[in-house]
Curated annotation (Swiss-Prot):
Its main location: membrane. This is Probable inorganic carbon transporter subunit DabA. InterPro entries: DabA. Its cofactor is Zn(2+).
Length: 839
């Protein structure tokens, strides 16, 4: 017997702990529990993630029960919300009947419309699920000290320093070690557990093995967790440090995307289990041992939660009825779009991201001029690139997080000689270093105290200008370090060349293939206008840690500027156009592609690289810019009501002011309200107000002979839209578990995430202010309704081919409908590769 095994034996509260599971069984349970955690992207590219991603192999109802038992989480709104919707007529008896007709989620849930209405009116306290207890939970009960919070705070404090990405000036001395090793090294010096009363903590710490996998196995053996409850227990532990576990899951996601693996999540689980064993050992004689044995017995034999399931079933039926109410109104709008005035050739075709915020602007632009056709496509416009700014050596992925960048593009200075480019790079790098040194002086532990006195008065002017919204508190990273003249000349460089050990740029065959793929995916292969605008999108906000969450998710949490500028360069290239003819795509010689960026906060559109637009199109461009200004005015007027902007004020000024107001917690509503995804020709939705709630993707199945574009839509944009929809869903129904709380209390930690206040777990999801205006829900949780105009046989074949798509659909995480020739919904997918006709 080794010394470690001897130490472990002597610390057990069981007389003779024996292995109940093989190491392989334990490793398999660890893997399954870790897969239940959804990734959390850092603030620098905060993209929307489905918080239920690890549970999509469960039905929506089953997942609701699992999360109630493992995290005390809700997946529906308070019952009073549905009762009010019934009372005011939003939910009708027909909606309730339709919800009941689909089946009862759990036994003894209401089975009639009358019973369901009575259930909604019931004001009795809502029961919660029997949450699987951890040893920390039991220790809290027997000692009176909140050990669950103490453990989370302790791990979070360590993790904030360990994962820090440049915010702190004193780095952890163990930052280069694997997470578990780094934590053990630091915990050996930490007396907080001893002060708090966990007298066995350091003894347990010393006795544990040196690797995370071995520690987990030893801890499970010591705790005698049965096989029937092991995955649930491990998942419960990870949910107790949900934010940091989610960030570790992101590290693994990124590693796996590029063919690697990351063990940080396993390390965190080992850390959490050390705490469990230590608390068990510390408080065994105070009642924890007996309480834990009862918990183990419940893991073996299950819990009696029939009453909770009855209530949960009723709540899920009300949620389903609420979704039927939305569906009824949406379907009534379709198939009645007014035909536009026939035009042989549009003056402008304007392609926007499918983002729901574009729906309002697209409708406004088409209202301004009937000679403009708008197009919806994922905002990276089919160009999955890594974009490296001038003077940087690495860039960000400008594509959906489901994809990996296929090309690396750098910035250069247009028209500059190599020496001028080098000088611009040197100057920007120097300014960035000086700014970093100055910031270190301001915030360093020693110099910060002497900074305010002699230098503080010099900041009075800037403070006033920032407060008035005239200047930005922090320079925009895209332009920081560049003078005005250089900034105007910076543009993407596509030429293939070696850079920092990599081959960057795009060859001509690569440009032709990418251009053909993008145009086909947009269903834009003929009848080109004189001007084709590709408009990416971004947002303008200040003092907002989650700012990148308002940028383009299809661009990996960045603006779409880089993608549209690259796309336009390629599509205007005569050599590329010549190559496109071999793909059956003939772009007229008088068609010019133009790059733009839609600011979703202000509804202003910026046109890039105007100097590249030929003089022959100068009048066309001026007219387009006037149309964009007019459309922006209409869009701001429509959004003003949701933003609580007084219509008697200068709406344009008031909306723009929000983008520079550093006290504004709701500069815009982002994608709040998202509820539908429609892939069809634009004429199906033209002239219809969808209230900024629908993702609109152009698709013409008649031009998609092999249905490869349909497959792309159902496996990429549809999935991304469901992630966004379910992130907003989770942040609304239970912001405590799936959201990030009160934005006014946020503190950035390590530049990668936020805490609510000065402690607690890293927060996931959206702030409460992103879904609620203080009086009502601006985002109403409705699972995504996907409407596609395509043969149901083609959609069924794609569902069969892709497991994740089938899981999302068969388990009710989103709804799929087919649109017919007349624009009306004809069929609904009901699961198991079956469809039913819609009345």
């Amino acid at each position: 017997m080794t010394m470690v095994e001897t130490n472990i034996k002597t610390m057990s509260v069981f007389a003779n702990p024996t292995p109940t599971l093989s190491r392989e069984d334990i490793a398999d349970a660890v893997r399954r529990a870790e897969q239940r955690i959804a990734p959390l992207w850092p603030l620098r590219n905060f993209v929307a993630v489905n918080p239920y991603l690890g549970l999509i192999d469960h039905s929506f109802a089953q997942a609701a029960h699992v999360l109630a038992c493992r995290a005390g989480a809700r997946m529906t709104l308070p019952r009073s919300f549905y009762a009010q919707a019934i009372a005011c007529g939003r939910i009708t008896d027909d909606d309730l009947a339709a919800a009941l007709a689909e089946g009862i989620p759990f036994r003894n849930a209401p089975e009639t419309v009358a019973a369901l209405k009575a259930f909604a009116r019931d004001n009795a306290p809502e029961p919660v699920g029997n949450v699987l207890p951890t040893v920390a939970d039991l220790a809290a009960k027997v000692t009176g000290s909140n050990w669950s919070t103490i453990v989370t705070d302790s791990i979070s404090n360590w993790a904030g320093a360990y994962f820090d990405q440049g915010q702190s000036y004193w780095r952890s001395p163990w930052a280069k070690l694997p997470a578990y090793e780094a934590w053990r090294a630091e915990a050996a010096f930490d007396r907080t557990p001893l002060v708090r009363g966990a007298r066995a903590f350091h003894r347990v710490l010393r006795a544990m093995p040196g690797t995370a996998a071995e520690t987990i196995a030893v801890a499970i053996e010591q705790l005698q967790v049965p096989a029937t409850g092991l995955e649930a227990y491990l998942h419960r532990l990870l949910l107790s440090i949900h934010g940091w576990a989610s960030y570790a899951r992101y590290l693994r996601w990124e590693a796996e995307l590029y063919g690697g693996h990351d063990k940080t999540l396993t390390d965190l689980l080992a850390i959490r289990l050390v705490w469990e064993v230590a608390l068990w050992q510390s408080f065994a004689r105070d009642g924890v041992a007996a309480a834990w044995e009862r918990s183990i017995d419940e893991m073996r034999h299950g819990q009696d939660d029939d009453e909770y399931k009855r209530v949960l079933g009723g709540d899920l039926l009300l949620q389903r009825a609420f979704e039927y109410a939305y569906r009824r109104q949406l379907f009534a709008q379709l198939g009645v779009a007014a035909p536009g005035t026939p035009v042989t050739r549009k003056r402008v075709q304007a392609a926007f991201c499918i983002d729901v915020r574009s729906e309002i602007f697209r409708r406004a632009l088409e209202t301004v001029s009937g000679e403009i056709e708008t197009i919806g496509f994922a905002g990276f416009f089919g160009f999955p690139i890594e974009y490296i700014p001038l003077a940087e050596v690495e860039g960000g992925a400008q594509c959906p997080v489901l994809l990996t960048p296929q090309f690396v593009i750098t910035e250069s200075v247009d028209g500059a000689t190599p020496s001028e480019v080098e000088a611009a790079i040197t100057k920007r790098a120097m300014r960035q270093r000086v700014a970093k040194a100055w910031r270190m002086f301001k915030f360093a532990p020693v110099s910060c105290f002497g900074f305010v006195g002699p230098v503080g008065l010099a900041y009075v002017r800037k403070l006033l200008l920032d407060t008035l919204g005239i200047t930005r508190p922090v320079p925009h990273p895209a332009t920081f370090g560049l003078d005005g003249q250089t900034r105007a000349r910076v543009k993407p460089s596509l030429e293939p060349r070696p850079f920092n050990g990599r081959l960057i740029g795009m060859s001509l065959p690569q440009r032709i293939a990418a251009a053909a793929g993008a145009l086909k995916a947009m269903s834009l292969t003929d009848n080109f206008a004189r001007i084709v605008l590709l408009a990416g999108h971004g947002s303008t906000t200040v003092n907002n840690p989650h700012a990148t969450g308002l940028d383009c998710g299809a661009c990996g949490g960045h603006t779409g500027e880089a993608n549209v500028r690259v796309a336009v360069q390629i599509l205007n290239d005569p050599a590329v156009r010549a190559g496109l003819r071999e793909h059956g795509i003939v772009i007229p010689s008088d068609t010019v592609f133009v790059a733009g960026l839609h600011d979703t906060t202000t509804d202003d559109v910026t046109i890039f690289d105007k100097g590249d637009i030929p003089a022959s199109h100068a009048d066309d461009l001026q007219r387009l810019e006037r149309d964009l200004v007019a459309a922006g005015r209409l869009a701001r007027a429509e959004r003003a009501a949701l933003l609580n902007v007084d219509r008697n004020t200068d709406i344009d000024r008031a909306v723009r002011r929000r983008s520079t107001d550093w006290s504004q917690v709701r500069p815009e509503w982002g994608l709040a309200g998202c509820a539908a995804f429609i892939a069809a020709p634009r004429e199906r939705t033209a002239g219809i107000s969808l209230d900024g709630r629908a993702f609109l993707h152009n698709y013409n199945w008649r031009q998609d002979g092999d249905f490869s574009v349909l497959e792309l839509i159902m496996t990429a944009p549809m999935i991304v839209a469901s992630w966004i929809n379910l992130q907003y869903f989770g942040s609304t129904v239970d912001n405590r578990v799936f959201g990030s709380g009160n934005k006014t209390l946020h503190n950035v930690v390590g530049t990668l995430g936020v805490l609510e206040g000065n402690g607690g777990d890293l927060r996931v999801g959206l702030p409460w202010q992103s879904v609620h205006d203080g009086k009502r829900y601006v985002h109403e949780p409705i699972r995504l309704h996907v409407l596609i105009e395509a043969p149901i046989e083609a959609m069924t074949a794609i569902i069969t081919k892709h497991e994740q798509v089938q899981q999302l659909l068969d388990n009710d995480w989103l709804y799929l409908f087919a649109i017919g020739e007349n624009g009306k919904v004809t069929h609904r997918y009901t699961g198991g590769l079956r469809w039913e006709t819609c009345a």
